[in-house]
Amino acid sequence: MNLGIPLELALILFSVNPTFDEMTKAKEWITASLGEESYAVPFSFNYGEQSSGNFIKTWKKEYSSEKLDENRTKHTIKFSDPDTHLEIRMESIVYSDFPAVEWVLYFKNNGSSDTPILDNILPLDIGFSGDKNYKLHYAKGALCCIDDFAPMEKTFGVGDSIHLQPGGGRSSSEFMPFFNLDMGIEGILIAIGWTGEWSATFNCDSEKNLQAKAGMALTHLKLHPSEEIRTPRIMMMFWKGEHTRGNNLLRRFILSHHRPKPNNTPLVLPIILSDWGGASADHHLEIIQRIIKNNLPIEYYWIDAEWFGKMPWHENAGNWEVRKELYPQGFKPISDMLHQSGRKFLLWFEPQRVCKGTPWYELKNRPNWLLELGDGTPEYKQRGINWGISHEDPRWIIYESRRNQIAENDMLLNIGEPEARKFLTDFLSDKVVEFGLDCYREDFNIAPLEYWRHADTSDRQGMTEIRYIESLYDMWDELLQRHPHLMIDNCASGGRRIDLETISRSTALWRTDWPADSLHKQCHSYGLFQWVPLHTTAGAVAENEYDLRSSMTAGLMVQFGSDDEKTRAILDQYLKIQKYFYGDYYPLTEYNTSRDVCMAWQFDYPEIGEGMVQAFRRENSSQESIKLYPKALDADAMYTMNNLDTSASDEMTGKELMENGFVVNTKNQPGSSIIVYKKSVNKDRDYYFDGRISREVLENYLSRSITMMDLLSG
């Protein structure tokens, strides 16, 4: 693509991209750890009761590389044991547009007999030396609480350590699988791609050396002849400056390289309206007709659970017959009406949990198709859809994370069994066609870990989980290949399977099961924005401006009120600012769950010299005004600040804004303010406003429809 942009202009435009120092740091580490001559590998394992560090240098090593595209090069390193014929294949991807590298390990038995035991396989095992001030930034997971995704910190002194894992086998239950290791003026982002039970440990020794280890929480297994397994994916990214820069590099990296692409177009999240599946088709059609009649900018219509089997929904997963009393003609009349108006259809499923008494429960007669819980942990067996305890009870977190049943005798469809995976893939693929689906919503309301471990034998611990997770990725990939238009909504009790692998294929449109009110939504956004750019939360009534603004993310879910004109106005306002949610994120206040404070954040798009600040005055806050200090502005540039509510406008330099701050007044209690800022035109500096680059071209870059290389090719 030739956009007619001078090279020097493109370099000015994208000066916010990774620095030379960051790219150099990454290159040095990659050469030392992944180079053709290096044996200083970033992984470890035990084999036959010996640590890999004691023998890996004696194994045969092969190296190859392959350029995948303009920004990615694949490096493959193979280590082979001459005695047992075990082969380890490390496939890494090195990025030329980010200071990042990621890798997966594969273990294959090329021998004619079982291997010795492979134990404690850690695809990440690296050390950092020197007297540095280590601080780990990480986040809580999604546990149906007000502090879901809350930012966490751990400062390391001599002898300090921290061990993290999600609990229950869903990757973002108790903790998120993203970490920012801050070393003062530089640091490393670490992300794990494993939709099961990962673990991560950080330990500081007596000489202030820090060791970081991550992998599956349990591996103790032998491989049969010709058998192969994979590990969790590990991503590392190097940054310099403040740790918020590292998090923003991660956001940009995800948008560039780990973003779903329906119809080969980078995903921009829609405005969605949802309703319950237990309502009738006539009810849904009436709502859709209202959307069409009033030309509301709602792109997706979402039908949730209870459209199948019998009531209640949580006791009928496994009976996927459409309820004819509600939908006598199925879903095609609904999807047809949506498609004819240029809109799309989303439908809920939970196909991996199988309830007793449903047709799929009979699949237990097929060997290894359904996994049993065994004795399980009695405290983790939920009956109904609540625990009978408050969210503040310390037992809540453990019970929610590790819930192994909702309905008595729940079983787990074992997609790790090839025929079972094919059965489910074909079933879902058929429903995409039959129902006219544009988005497949996959829920997953039980923690699978105890099912997996109950199925393992003592010399194959971890194998059931490995096969299950491998097959989950294979199934999603095949669905996306068969139906290139399809979007996958990854729910899992609200946001409990968010990791580097899932966000590449799916999006969490319901990021937590506890979006109780505006306060909760603000707290959830504050935390999750720092790590993952694409997600949405529960819908707000469109006329409730405070709640709707608290719900705004890279996409938006709404519910109808009574005034369609007001609904259109606020949705139009959202569409004007939606692009900023794809920019760099900066918290401007401390994280706080209290109702008597204000919370604010900033989204900045330096590529176009624009951004916005959102401020929320909570219901018990006495602060009518708050002074905020935006980040990452051009100190010498002049900015115009526009308040979308009052139409008030002001001009200040970037330096004045960052050093002296500006005051936001919010009279309503509760209330919110949105301030949009824009660099003033200066043709000596702001070349991209002088007509040589259209706004359309810039916004194509922001949505990643084109790459930086497209610009540089001019």
Labelled PLM ranges:
Residues 16-203, 207, 217-219, 638-646:
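Polysaccharide-binding surfaces and accessory modules of carbohydrate-active proteins
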Residues 18, 231, 446, 472-650, ...:
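Active-site-proximal substrate-binding groove within the catalytic cores of carbohydrate-active enzymes
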Residues 323, 327-330, 334, 374-545, ...:
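Active-site neighborhood of glycoside hydrolase catalytic domains
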